[in-house]
Amino acid sequence: MSEPQQSARPDARSGARPKAKIHIADLRKSFGPKTVLDGVSIDVAPAESLVIIGGSGTGKSVLLKHIIGLLKQDSGTVEVDGTAVEKLGNREITEFRRKFGMAFQEGALFDSMSVWKNVAFPLQRLKKLSHGEIRERVEECLTMVRLEGVGEKLPSQLSGGMRRRVGFARAVAHEPEILLFDEPTTGLDPVTTALIDEVILDLNDRLKTTTVTITHDMESAFRIGDRIAMLARGKIIAEAPPEEFRRLEDPRVQQFIHGRADGPLSEDAPPRESQREPRGSETS
């Protein structure tokens, strides 16, 4: 079965495809004998929210690191705004990364710094702003993620979901063009997950950024994505808008959506242990 390699979503008015903000073609990366990315090709349109799903160890985080220039591919192409990322020198890559805001799994906050100082950190490094301008921007970002009034608190005084949102505020503080979310809802309860999803949707709507999110959480993926792509065994095996993705007949997609233990995705998993003896069957 040939693997679908769709490009960025068409323009609704003209039917033409917009120029990709992110263009990835035949991307390959191995670590020693292990092939992690095996010919990944996908485009992300300007202001699109792409969600990449897939099991643990399928290369989702490795793909993000190539987009931002933290890893260099073995072969293939990664372009952002038409610029080949791997060709950037040290000085150029520093400037290039200012295009991005990245929110990590656990927030990745500085524990010894207040919320305010955490959010202000990229502004102090990347922007020439007065103290008053920085304070105004920090308060604006905290309001965007629904965290008014917590600026003086330490990360240890916040819940897990609040720490994630502080990470979001820091990620958008310097007004990036592209947002990368790494497992934004992992380990959170369903109510907090729904709130995180609402905040991501609000940020996308307000800031019009191009967004790439990696997640295991299918309900979250269906809520926040304009398009969902599935990575398995080093390849993009399917991609479609959320409602179309739900209806895809590919058994790998359906196994992942429904969280089934048995199916084609389980073929590479180690064999399950033999069934335990029933209780009471042990010899004394």
Question: What are the roles of these predicted feature ranges?
Answer:
Residues 112-121:
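Short coil-to-helix segment of the ABC ATPase nucleotide-binding domain corresponding to the Q-loop/switch region
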Residues 154-158, 162:
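Conserved ABC ATPase signature
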Residues 175:
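Conserved catalytic motifs of ABC-family nucleotide-binding domains
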